[in-house]
Swiss-Prot record:
Species the sequence originates in: Nitratiruptor sp. (strain SB155-2)
Alphabetized SUPFAM superfamilies for the sequence: Amidase signature (AS) enzymes (SSF75304)
Protein name, entry field: Glutamyl-tRNA(Gln) amidotransferase subunit A
Underlying gene: gatA
EC numbers on record: 6.3.5.7
Keywords noted in UniProt: ATP-binding, Ligase, Nucleotide-binding, Protein biosynthesis
Amino acid sequence: MITLKEALSKPKGELQEIKDELKKRAQEQSEINAYVALDESGEGVPVAIKDNIQVDGWEVTCASKILKGYIAPYDATVIQKLRANGLAPFGRTNMDEFAMGSTTETSCYGKTLNPKDTSRVPGGSSGGSAAAVAAGIAIAALGSDTGGSIRQPAAFCGVVGMKPTYGRVSRYGLAAYGSSLDQIGPMTQNVEDAAILYNIIAGSDAKDSTSARIECKPVVPDPKRKLKIGVVPNYVKDASGAIQKAYDKAIEALKQEGHEIIEISLMDAKYDIASYYITAMAEASTNLSRYDGVRYGYRAEAKNLKEMYLKTRSEGFGEEVKRRILLGTFVLSSGYYDAYYIKAQKARHIIKDEYNKVFEKVDLILSPVAPDVAFEFGAMKTPLEMYLSDVYTIGVNLAGLPAISLPVDEHEGLPVGLQLIGKAFDEQTVFDGAMSLENALK
């Protein structure tokens, strides 16, 4: 598959040929279900778009029945930036409904399969974007990351996935799940392409009140820069043998490149999980209250307004979304607000402070992305099992840090990805370390 860097140098005529070839390949591999629609919009290098990012004139549904028929009346800021830089939206990728999930199984369009092994999950919630890039039916894609939704599917499918610092990329036009956690980012074939796409979409935006009003310099990855990289033995001991082997391999590769490896420790990640899910579900319960059948999307037949609200939301939302709305409403209720929500925010501040202290000693942290390689469909028996599998990714979102997942090893034909975590607004160092590691593993 042609890389993003190569595609950007092609004339218009060749780009149309590339689009036609991508469409043909996608139709031939339709059983993967990476795309929910092969829409096109404008001229330029084709970039696949997750189904929760607004593209003017496209049906954008967040993979939910409740938004079926909704046509986006505007472009998200990231889409405007793509168009301004010679790229064009191409294809809506599948996802977990409203980005709530880790397997891309909760979509109203059916599950997406992992191109590396179709009996296994592609990860989620940006599983369609990861699968499309891995299957060679997308040059690059945009995803969103609330608690690992770019990095985990990237690791499961063997591609590069980058979550920028919170506030670095505009959220204007991204359907909100957890407003203090969500961030749009690139999913690509290699680190260089991720840096190119990141440079295009990053920057302050007056239309997004959570956008950081600080200078955003383009990153130019420097693989020769020597860095202090923190490793976390107490984190890795609970991961599978395949993850531990890949972790050791990455450490050796980084040492060979001249980086200084420093052992660090982080607080027990069980606090990350509790703080994250209370925060994310509370924010989801308020953000999703707007989907009521009145203004847009699905509307159930009903005799009165109250019945319409009840039936629309009961029929329109899937089981996982309803579960999270209920839990979020519970932790925000008057009797439990202090006991759960306020306590979660205090824990979040402690988690952020801990990362800040660690970054006084190191430039980057090397961490697993998931406890194991991509698992088989049906392997996770309960929602709690699924939530616990996010243990390595959610702390990054709670602290608002940048991180990049890249393939490091293989286990029985399945990709093993690890992540490099950086200081807030220091994407340059994240890309420096990632390109150095990628080069060392070639």
